[in-house]
Amino acid sequence: MFASCHCVPRGRRTMKMIHFRSSSIKSLSQEMRCTIRLLDDSEISCHIQRETKGQFLIDHICNYYSLLEKDYFGIRYVDPEKQRHWLEPNKSIFKQMKTHPPYTMCFRVKFYPHEPLKIKEELTRYLLYLQIKRDIFHGRLLCSFSDAAYLGACIVQAELGDYDPDEHPENYISEFEIFPKQSQKLERKIVEIHKNELRGQSPPVAEFNLLLKAHTLETYGVDPHPCKDSTGTTTFLGFTAAGFVVFQGNKRIHLIKWPDVCKLKFEGKTFYVIGTQKEKKAMLAFHTSTPAACKHLWKCGVENQAFYKYAKSSQIKTVSSSKIFFKGSRFRYSGKVAKEVVEASSKIQREPPEVHRANITQSRSSHSLNKQLIINMEPLQPLLSSPSEQEEELPLGEGVPLPKEENISAPLISSSPVKAAQEYEDPPSEEEDKIKEEPLTISELVYNPSASLLPTPVDDDEIDMLFDCPSRLELEREDTDSFEDLEADENAFLIAEEEELKEARRALSWSYDILTGHIRVNPLVKSFSRLLVVGLGLLLFVFPLLLLLLESGIDLSFLCEIRQTPEFEQFHYEYYCPLKEWVTGKVHRILYMLGCS
């Protein structure tokens, strides 16, 4: 039996797709509506079944766009706990979603092309442009003042075309919400570049120039994950074409290139990156707010490493976030790698498809322009008609200082848009001189990456609350107890301690009676107890012996293999070395006291 699958973006266009389904009555009763929001904020809808896999939705959208370079894109959704996920193509959609239908997802760029020059078709470049525009608006793209002005001018040129004094009033840039917060100085610079440098550029050319500039920035392609490092400092982790990156504030403090990343793993809320830095093995540990966030971070890392690192998809292996004694989560990236995608793009020989750009030039009102740009938000739950829907909001807190212009390296080519922009600097006024003396903040540019990850943007104070534990809150509580309360608490503690000692004595006497035969127990229980005691005894003997062999310099093949595993390195550096130092210190102290006596 065949059934049609409709795709209706805002009631403007209609498309039909044919999807084979079983003719059973049960499958007919399990149809579920799914809505996907696209990068231009239009929507398409279709009906799926319980067994429909994620690849069907990806193909559905790519057929709607007539998109061939589809491996850069993915579908994202948010679960009821507000944790974001990428839809896995080889798994059932129904099993991945943790909410009841109808489902709402969004179509986004998943892997940012390392070199936009190698994108073959204009359609793919336009979709990437829409994603970069969203990244700029949500504060995910960190850049200098001159770069921000040029990026903003490219957006204005692509959306409005050439500057026309009859159509564009004096404050026409203020109608565009390009950045979360933008100063008048930044708007004046955007106007200047739009008037003088971008005239004559068609929308595809302006969009392409934006991609060329954006891909040179450090935070290009970074989807920041908020974490805490070992010192409790808020950091943001990300994955780019270059490798694994760590940001604190506006500074990149770590970059481990993909060939140097040995293993990515997670345990509970802790994410580990084991790699090579300065020819030495290092392990970085970061703490997330929930185990689900940690697993999502790990899967994103595994997918990005596979996409950017390997030459062929056949080289990709199933990875396991293994623990020392138990098997952890297993995951394998099943798509193409970057080199295969570029090679496939170079072989495209068809007539380029028509690109339908979102038309925002019909209305010049501030409300309509802002609505068109501000509506770029991540969908969480079903449609707007659903009261449970939540969307991203603008960053509310103050941003972090950004690098000054003189600290930004000069462009490599003379025709660089940024270099041309610097030649047209405004004559310094008193207001601008005052601004230049201070580091750029959220009033001019923004890097508030937490807004891109959590549905409701949070600042450092709120992130701290995510990581607060009851013990920490107890320590921070004001000491307002009276002396009588403290004395009563001490007496209660002593009574509880005596009760625990009595229980321990009773347990020891009961165990002694069982071992000596004074108390009869089931023979099966007695055999199991003896087996348990023997097993524990062997473990207490074998484990120290194995540890002694591993820590010695004995060069045996199986010992060398165990020493090179990330799990043993973690045990060595986090447990064995601190314990060894503590025992050594105690022994030295005892020997010193004996020598003095």
Curated annotation (Swiss-Prot):
Q: Where is this region: Disordered?
A: 409-435
Acidic residues compositional bias, start-end: 423-432
A molecular function (GO) held by this record is:
cytoskeletal protein binding
> What does UniProt give as GO cellular component?
cytoskeleton; membrane
Keyword match Cytoplasm: no
Coarse class of the primary localization is: membrane
Q: Which UniProt keywords apply?
A: Membrane, Transmembrane, Transmembrane helix
InterPro entries attached here? Band_41_domain, Ez/rad/moesin-like, FA, FERM/acyl-CoA-bd_prot_sf, FERM_2, FERM_central, FERM_CS, FERM_domain
Location in or out of the cell:
Membrane
Q: How does it sit in the membrane?
A: Single-pass membrane protein
User: Where in the numbering of this chain does the FERM domain appear?
Assistant: 32-312
Aminoacyl-tRNA synthetase is among the record's keywords:
no
Q: What does this protein do?
A: Putative tumor suppressor gene that may be implicated in the origin and progression of lung cancer.
Q: What is this protein called?
A: FERM domain-containing protein 3
Taxonomic source organism: Pongo abelii (Sumatran orangutan)
